[in-house]
Design a protein with these regions (language model features):
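Cytoplasmic helix-loop-helix junction between adjacent transmembrane helices
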Residues: 111-151
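Residue-level signature of mid-helix packing/kink "hotspots" within the transmembrane helices
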Residues: 31, 59-67, 154-155, 249, ...
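Helix-loop-helix hairpin linking two adjacent transmembrane segments in secondary transporters
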Residues: 146-198
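Conserved MFS/SLC helix-loop-helix module at the cytosolic interface between two early adjacent transmembrane helices
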Residues: 64-105
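Extracytoplasmic gate region of multi-pass secondary transporters
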Residues: 33-34, 230-287, 342-346, 350, ...
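A late C-terminal transmembrane helix in Major Facilitator Superfamily
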Residues: 284, 354-390
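Glycine-rich segments within core transmembrane alpha-helices of 12-TM secondary carriers
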Residues: 140-162, 280-284, 370-380
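C-terminal ends and interior cores of transmembrane alpha-helices
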Residues: 87-102, 310-326
Length: 433
């Protein structure tokens, strides 16, 4: 477990709490359309291909935004970069409520595009915050804590949306407006709380020393992302993010699958999502703690991260049989194991970046990697929407087969690209110990 002894202090966890809050808002905002998908399709007469176009719009913007939002955060700092991100996504989130039925498809495509640009800054900023405020041995656990908030947002969405929105779609605008209020509160707290550890007046010398105990000093110079592309370590991380499409499949298509397969509607989607995403939260926390605990027991960072990710990949495998399961609750539990394994995999994947790259490159590398993952998810959305319109539910069969089997294959390639996880210095040269 992380060091929180009174002599050291734990102010860093206040900063982490704000990252947790921001990511919860991020995923609540992101999840609203997925929860309302069956209702919105009926209300606006969308086909599966139309719904896929709305999802693709978000992901195109999200992937493109990751390139420059990561660079903005690296160049201008976490405090201002994170603020810009959440203000942008809040504005476009609330704009969903202004869309009129006659322009529903075009309106949602435009609003989701703006939302994707803003939300693309959250994870690069969050991981950079953890890299600034936590030593390497605690980063996986800290990342697990804030990554668990993705499930909190996904859990809150069906209950809040289900309580506000009727089955026929009345009051569908209100959840989008609610996110703006929550985001305004976060911006106020963030601007009045965050500073870098070295200059924070409320941080004790002992805690600052602990934060810097196994961390390199950060310089003001930033590494352009074009210099990062040739590094095989960048591509190793990018491969781990390809599985983000699986998580988004659960998030954006999960309610549709449960509705079409088991007649689950907007009023009773809450409990299945609660089970799935509570399991995901548990996976996030356990996965983050496990690799950190192994490192503290003397395991190398390389071995601890990869063994943890291997266990995750094995846990995820049974999700391949979900489409042929007759029981709703067994299907929900298997999806829950898939989500839990993914979250554990994801937080260990994120920590590969600060484990290997210097701090000044962290947000940019994550942005590049996430963009690659988003590109794959876009292709998957287009294919799934097309297949569902033409062949009913057979598209779900292949979606779950890929969702369950891809992690083992990807981990093999990650190991080939980065067998020893040798860290890089500020010049992107290997540090030989």
């Amino acid at each position: 477990m992380t060091n929180t002894a009174p002599g050291i202090g734990n102010y860093r966890y206040r900063i982490l709490a704000l990252v947790f809050m921001a990511t919860t808002i991020n995923y609540f905002d992101r999840s609203i359309v997925g929860v309302m998908a069956p209702t919105l399709q009926k209300l606006f007469d969308w086909s599966n291909k139309d719904y896929a176009a709305v999802m693709v719009s978000f992901k195109i913007a999200y992937g493109a935004g990751l390139l420059f939002m990561g660079g903005i955060i690296d160049r201008f700092g976490t405090k201002l970069g994170y603020t810009l991100s959440i203000v942008t996504w809040s504005i476009f989130g609330m704009l969903h409520a202004a869309i009129r039925p006659a322009f529903s498809l075009a309106g949602f495509i435009a609003a989701r595009f703006g939302l994707g640009i803003g939300e693309s800054g959250n994870f690069p900023a969050a991981v950079k915050t953890v890299a600034e405020w936590f030593p390497k041995k605690d980063r996986a656990f800290a990342t697990g804590i804030f990554d668990a908030s993705t499930s909190v947002g996904a859990i809150l969405a069906p209950f809040i949306v289900g309580a506000i929105v009727t089955i026929d779609g009345k009051n569908w605008q209100i959840p989008f407006l609610l996110t703006g209020l929550l985001s305004s509160l976060w911006v106020y707290l963030w601007l009045n709380t965050y500073q870098k550890p070295a200059v924070h007046p409320k941080l004790s010398k002992a805690e600052l020393a602990y934060i810097n105990s196994d961390s390199e000093e950060e310089t003001d110079e930033k590494i352009p992302w074009l210099k990062l592309l040739p590094k095989k370590e960048t591509w190793a991380f990018s491969l781990t993010t390809v599985t983000d499409g699986v998580w988004w499949f659960y998030l954006f298509w999960g309610a549709k699958f449960l509705g079409e397969q088991f007649d689950v509607d907007i009023k009773n989607i809450g409990l299945p999502f609660l089970i799935i995403f509570v399991m995901a939260d548990a996976g996030s926390l356990i996965g983050g703690y496990a690799s950190g605990a192994l490192i503290k027991r003397g395991w190398s960072i390389n071995k601890a991260r990869k063994i943890t990710m291997l266990v995750c990949a094995i846990i995820i495998l049974p999700v391949t049989i979900v489409p042929v399961i007759a029981s709703k609750w067994i299907a929900v539990i298997l999806i829950g194991f898939g989500a839990a394994g993914h979250q554990s995999w994801s937080i260990n994947g994120y920590t590969l970046v600060p484990d290997v790259f210097p701090k000044k490159a962290v947000a940019s590398v994550i942005g590049i990697g996430k963009m690659i993952g988003v590109a794959v998810a876009i292709i998957a959305d287009i294919a799934l929407g097309t297949v569902l319109d033409r062949a009913n539910n057979s598209g779900y069969f292949w979606a779950f087969v890929i969702a369950g089997s891809s992690y083992l294959v990807i981990l093999g390639f990650v190991h080939l690209l980065m067998p020893k996880m040798t860290p890089l210095d500020d010049k992107l040269e290997y540090i030989r110990k």
